Amino acid sequence: MAAPGIHHVDLAVTDVERSLGFYLDLLGPLGWAEQVRYPTYRGTEEVVYLARGEIRDGGLGLRPADSGTHRYYDVGIEHFAFEVDRREEVDEAHARCVASGANIHFPPEEDRDEPGYYAFFVFDPDGIRVEVFCWER
């Protein structure tokens, strides 16, 4: 069982399958996979959940948005982060994003204020900023 805390995040996206491809490319090699699809409460579309391990331990949901693209610093989510175990995993995830043509916001680097905190930032297909990091404490 996972530790108490944030369990899952659902993102409203313009194209669920496109976003699913992005997140599977980014997170698949880290053990994340599509786990389940459910009809939304509207009943006209599906929400797709990805997780690393059991879906009951939390994950990421992708559901159809009602309107256009997210703009960085609009009201809503500014960014969210995925933690990995090693710097090499950060570098590998970054390389996959570069190879896919994703919009990189910041390349991998160590944080100047937090020793051992190593991260990169990328925008998903809808402009939502995603961080992949490791923290060698």
Go through the PLM ranges and name each one.
Residues 10-57:
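Core segments of cupin and vicinal oxygen chelate
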Residues 40, 53-54, 69-70, 113-118:
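Acidic pyrophosphate-coordinating catalytic loop
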Residues 2, 6-14, 71-96, 98-137:
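Vicinal oxygen chelate
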Residues 45-85, 92, 99:
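Long, continuous compositionally biased terminal/linker segments
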Residues 22-26, 93-98:
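Short amphipathic alpha-helices in soluble, non-transmembrane regions
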Residues 27, 37-43, 85-86, 107, ...:
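Short, charged helix-to-loop "capping" segments that act as catalytic/coupling loops
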